[in-house]
Structures are given as structure tokens and as C-alpha cells.
Amino acid sequence: QALIGAEDAGRDMEAVRNALLHRFDENAFARVIYTESHDEVANGKARVPEEVDPGNASSWAAKKKSVLGASLVFTAPGIPMIFQGQEFLEDDWFHDKDPLDWSKKERYAGIVRVYVDLIALRLNRRGQTAGLCGQQIDVYHTDQRNKVLAYHRWQDGGRGDSVVVVVNFSTQLLENYEVAFPVAGEWKVRFNGDSRYYDPEFSNGGVYRCD
């Protein structure tokens, strides 16, 4: 509901926080994390972009919430799962006799790049985000009024390991908003889901200072 609700007032950051921290038998990898699955989008049920903006699954709001959902899936502790076509904003409900609309892969190439980049971060392919492969998470910033969460992911901690994820669930671009970091030192932005690199309609907002 935090993703697909029309009004910011209905987004419950405590519920999202609890979902991020939930695990079975103290093992983060005993659960699968997703926003779309066979059961969720089959038999006439809608996919996330369609739920966000019915009849206009390629709108700014639909794309933003799709990217936000993907960002959570690939940075939360657990086994990430995406459903076929999710990476290019497939909006039709799943039916095993209907093929995917592969033209959307080119039409929404920027959204596909979101998934490529998030998968690379999740797998620590550049040796900078090992924490996303680990068990540990600390949701240390929960702002119910502005609909912002920040959490620290780590495996052993330190350079090339610790990762901070900041997510804005609201429909507003927040300027001059400050979030503390868990430890002192130099931090670098590795992914900005609001970048126009991913979609020309995005605001290109993001972190201007990290220390």
C-alpha cells in the first residue's frame, strides 16, 4: 500500500520499516522479496504501474513508484525476485497465453537500466556494495511526516561494504533534507533513482553533499 496508494497520507513508514526488518529464524535469506509475482498479477489483477495510475502505467507517478519498489527489492535483506516484464513497465495482468510486449524494452530502456544497475549493486559486481549481500540492516531514520526512510546495510562493515539507502515515498521532491550517516567518513552516491539518466521526466534531484 505504501507504493500504490494515491495519497501520501496513507503511506505507513512504520509498516515499511517492519517489513524491512522481518525475517524467519534470524535468517534474512529465508525469505523472498518482491513487489510483483504470479499470484499478485494473474487472473485479472493489476501490476504495480497500473495500480499506481490505472490506464496510464507509463505516467511519471507509475514509473517513480515502480523504480522505488525495485530499489527496495534489491536493497532489502533477502532473496530479490522480479516478475517477467516488470523491468520494462509491463502493465497487463499475467496470462500464460499472452506474450510480453517486447517493444517496451526499447521504449522504456531507462527503466531497464534501473534494474541492470540495481542488480549490479545487489551482487556487488564493482566491489563497492558488499553490505547488500549481507544479513545486517539498521533502519535508523523513519520520518512519517515526510515519508522518508534510511537504512544501513552491511556484511562486515567498512569501505566497500557499508551501504546507506535513503528512500522517499512521497510525491514531493524534498530539498534541503538532511539524513545522518551511521559512521563518519567519505560516502559516495552509487545509485540515484531520480536521475534523468533513467527517464527524462524525472527531476534529477538527489544528494548534493555526502560527508
Where are these regions (language model features)?
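Conserved alpha/beta catalytic core and glycan-binding cleft of carbohydrate-active enzymes
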Residues: Q1-H95, L123-T129, Q136-G193
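A polyampholytic, Gly/Pro-enriched intrinsically disordered region
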Residues: I4-G5, R209-D211
